[in-house]
Swiss-Prot record:
GO cellular component, one term: cytoplasm
GO biological process per UniProt: thiamine biosynthetic process; thiamine diphosphate biosynthetic process
UniProtKB keywords: Magnesium, Metal-binding, Thiamine biosynthesis, Transferase
SUPFAM superfamilies per UniProt: Thiamin phosphate synthase (SSF51391)
Function, in words: Condenses 4-methyl-5-(beta-hydroxyethyl)thiazole monophosphate (THZ-P) and 2-methyl-4-amino-5-hydroxymethyl pyrimidine pyrophosphate (HMP-PP) to form thiamine monophosphate (TMP).
Keyword presence, S-adenosyl-L-methionine: no
Annotated protein name in UniProt: Thiamine-phosphate synthase
Source organism per UniProt: Photorhabdus laumondii subsp. laumondii (strain DSM 15139 / CIP 105565 / TT01)
Cofactor binding annotation: Binds 1 Mg(2+) ion per subunit.
Chain residues that bind Mg(2+): 73, 92
Entry's EC annotation: 2.5.1.3
Length: 216
């Protein structure tokens, strides 16, 4: 890991609530309009020459809605365009300039998949820690096994000083069990983007996770 910071990363809300992870500016625009306030842009298949513009536009849109927009992986562009925060996987921690991210005031979220990675994340004092994957998922190839709700509950209890995010295979039906662990946020991908009616799914999820009932 390069240039380890000697201070904690900027804090974020202890309970981030519903946290959709999407791959395009179009999805960010749709979800911010429905009342989502925490969101992640995880670009996967965009040509490299289009990535910066997509990130810049997403950050501007996030500011417009006063949202907590985290950029996955592209920490240099997140710094350059003044993102709210960055999300890094374990492999990204090795190459990212964590000191630069911390000094610019960006919030940092870190993925973890077991107790060892959780301990490593805590040592960096990030803004939030993602705990996963909780259930089997087809969104991303995972070398680790699903941890399940009981392990999630234990990890949340052992991480009281951090904002925590549950991620991995969480469907609408599984949300109540996940919330019952005390986790501060629920990250979802397919439950929204592959729903028959994404607006209805988002409204249901906002109600389940944050108690927000959308009008109209």
């Amino acid at each position: 890991m390069n240039n380890l910071p000697n201070a904690p990363f900027a804090p974020t809300e202890h309970r981030l609530g519903l946290y959709p992870v999407v791959d395009s500016l179009a999805w960010i625009s749709r979800l911010l309009q429905t009342g989502v306030t925490t969101i992640q842009l995880r670009i996967k298949d965009l040509p490299e020459d289009q990535v910066e513009e997509e990130i810049q536009q997403a950050i501007m849109l996030g500011r417009q809605y006063n949202a907590r927009l985290f950029i996955n992986d592209y920490w240099r562009l997140a710094i350059k365009h003044g993102a709210y925060g960055v999300h890094l996987g374990q492999e990204d921690l090795v190459i990212a300039d964590l000191n630069a991210i911390q000094k610019t005031g960006l919030r940092l979220g870190i993925s973890t998949h077991d107790e060892q990675e959780l301990a490593r994340a805590k040592s960096l004092r990030p803004s939030y820690i993602a705990l996963g994957h909780i259930f089997p998922t087809t969104t991303k190839a995972m070398p680790s096994s699903p941890q399940g709700v009981e392990a999630l509950k234990r990890q949340v209890e052992n991480t009281p000083d951090y904002s925590t995010v549950a991620i991995g295979g969480i469907s609408l039906e599984r949300v109540p069990d996940v919330i019952a662990t005390g986790v501060g946020s629920v990250a979802l991908v397919s439950a929204i983007t592959k729903a028959k009616d994404w607006r209805q799914a988002t409204a249901q999820l906002l109600y389940l996770v944050e108690g927000i009932e959308l009008k109209g």
